[in-house]
Amino acid sequence: LVGTVYGSAMLVAETLCDHLQADGHVCQIFDDAALTDIDASRVLLIVTATTGQGDIPPNLQSFASALADRAPYMKGWRYALIAMGDSSYEHFCGAGRSLDALLQELAAEPLVVHLEIDATVEDEPEVAALAWLKTWENRL
C-alpha cells in the first residue's frame, strides 16, 4: 500500500515488491486502495510519504479515513510500515507515525518496528528500505 506525492514512496514500494517477488512471495502494489481491497490473511506493507503538516498523501487518505472512521478490529492483521519524510520539517514522518499508531490501536500486529527514511540523509531511499526488509523478510 503506497502513499505518495512525488513518486519516491512508489519507487521504494516497487523496489521492495520486485525483491519480494524474486524471492517467491506474492506482492501487489495498491496506490488507491479501499479497506475492502486488503486481504487480512496477508502481510500489509505500507510505504508512505508525509505531506503538508504531517499529513497522509491524498491517494492514501480514503484508506486512512476508513480505518479511523470504521475502527475495524484488526486482530490477526500483520503489517510493516515505512514512513518517509524530511527531518527539517516539524512533523517529520507524521503520516507514517499516525498510521502506525492507528493500526496498533486497532489491534493489528507490526512485524517489525517501522522504518523512518529521512530525505535529508538518504539519497536513495529504496536502498535503505531494501536493507530493512532483508532484516525481517524471513518472518513472511
Q: What residues fall within each predicted segment?
A:
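Short, solvent-exposed loop/turn elements at beta->coil junctions and helix N-caps
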Residues: D32-L35
